[in-house]
A protein has these predicted regions:
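Charge-biased low-complexity segments
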Residues: 21-167
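Bacterial Sec-dependent N-terminal signal peptides
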Residues: 1-33
Length: 167
């Protein structure tokens, strides 16, 4: 019985050490990415990084709360999306159709954006040229945005948005 407990404890320690090693390896892979604005498909295809693994490094900010999510937290997420729209407008980006967008911000403990994952949804997709311009605007936008709600650990927040046509 005692030997079994020691073996189980040893396996648990090895599993924990392996998990930490994998997280460190993933963190180093993320640091080497040439961009902080990317789609999950590009992340998998070009860099062999699975977004599920990334979420272990950046657990949802919502996990910090019990049954009640503070309105101030939700307001910050809304501000992220609204300010993103302002950044696109200030960059004089134009588009003729509405685009639906899934997005996930990955934030440091101080609220600065470390990575921005996105995916366009639905049948109407932007042209590759427009999407490239979108990525450039987002790269600049995330340099200055700060999520002003104290979580005090790395976290992520996802949601969807609709980019209305600029007719």
């Amino acid at each position: 019985m005692k030997k079994t407990l020691i073996t189980v404890a040893t396996i648990a320690v090895i599993a924990l050490a392996t998990s930490c090693k994998n997280e460190m390896f993933l963190a180093k892979k993320l640091e080497k990415l040439p961009t902080k604005v990317i789609t999950p498909a590009e992340l998998r295809k070009n860099y062999n990084i699975n977004t599920v693994a990334v979420e272990k490094l950046y657990p949802s900010g919502l996990e910090s709360f019990g049954d009640t999510i503070p309105q101030a937290y939700l307001d910050e997420w809304t501000r992220f999306i609204m300010d993103m729209g302002k950044a696109l407008k200030e960059a004089d980006m134009k588009w003729e159709k509405d685009y639906r967008l899934w997005l996930r911000g990955h934030y440091s403990a101080d609220g600065s954006v470390e990575y921005f994952f996105y995916n366009f949804l639905g049948q109407d997709m932007p042209s590759p040229e427009w999407e490239a311009q979108f990525q450039e605007v987002m790269k600049e936008y995330i340099k200055t945005f700060r999520f002003n709600y104290p979580i005090n650990r790395k976290f992520s927040q996802c949601g969807s948005a609709r980019l209305q046509a600029t007719k």
